[in-house]
Amino acid sequence: MNGIHDLGGMHGFGPVDAEENEPVFHHEWEARAFALNLAAGFLGRWNIDMGRYAREHMPPAEYLATTYYEHWLYGLERLLVEKSLITAKELETMRSQGPAAVKALSPADVPRALRNRRAARMDDRLAAPRFKAGDRVRTKNLHPTGHTRLPRYARDKVGVIDRDHGVFILPDEHANSGAKVPAHCYAVRFEGRELWGADAGPRDAVFVDCFEPYLEPADRPGAPPR
């Protein structure tokens, strides 16, 4: 999905100011928003990539004018309505229209539930990787309407495989259908001038984690030269 959340390489937004001794939460409501996301996630109606995709639907002007945890709250509200856990009217009025049809975790169950969260690794689910360290690859020119982890600035670019991180759930399909499709994930090194042109520093490089379906051999027959 080409949205305002994918800001890499865009101009005009000013510097990223690092806050010294930054707290985990700046306001009490942010901690509540974070806890609500975790608690609702334990209901099993969506996964982490669906959560990211929900936040990506925030209108661009609203996205730029709001904070990190406001994005989280927007995505949660959207999912609660989409999954019929609340109605749009209940969200608008902030009043329940009836008893909830879900069973919430008890405080005593929370530590166990957090410990039991499963990692996205699927190393036992796929054969040998298609690429290895040192291989030249080209990212595909993908512009899906659904979720993807391939940033716009790194599409249709040539890089070199630095390492294979292993096999993980492919976020794209996980967000769109919930299917757990295994895919190798590689750290790919892109030279700065490959991404940004002649204005980039000659010693600059960017490492992007790319899933195997995003990549193809750079030296395939008929590929444009680099």
Predicted regions and their residues:
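Short, basic/aromatic beta-hairpin or loop at an interaction surface
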Residues: 102-118
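Short, solvent-exposed coil/turn linker segments
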Residues: 47, 87, 106-107, 127, ...
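Residue-level preference for alpha-helix termini and adjacent loops
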Residues: 57, 62, 68, 85, ...
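N-terminal intrinsically disordered, low-complexity, charge/repeat-rich segments that act as generic
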Residues: 1-102
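Generic detector of short, locally flexible boundary/turn motifs and exposed helical patches
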Residues: 2-3, 41-43, 100-105, 123-128, ...
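Basic/aromatic-rich interaction segments and small domains that mediate binding to polyanionic partners
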Residues: 10, 15-37, 79, 118-133, ...
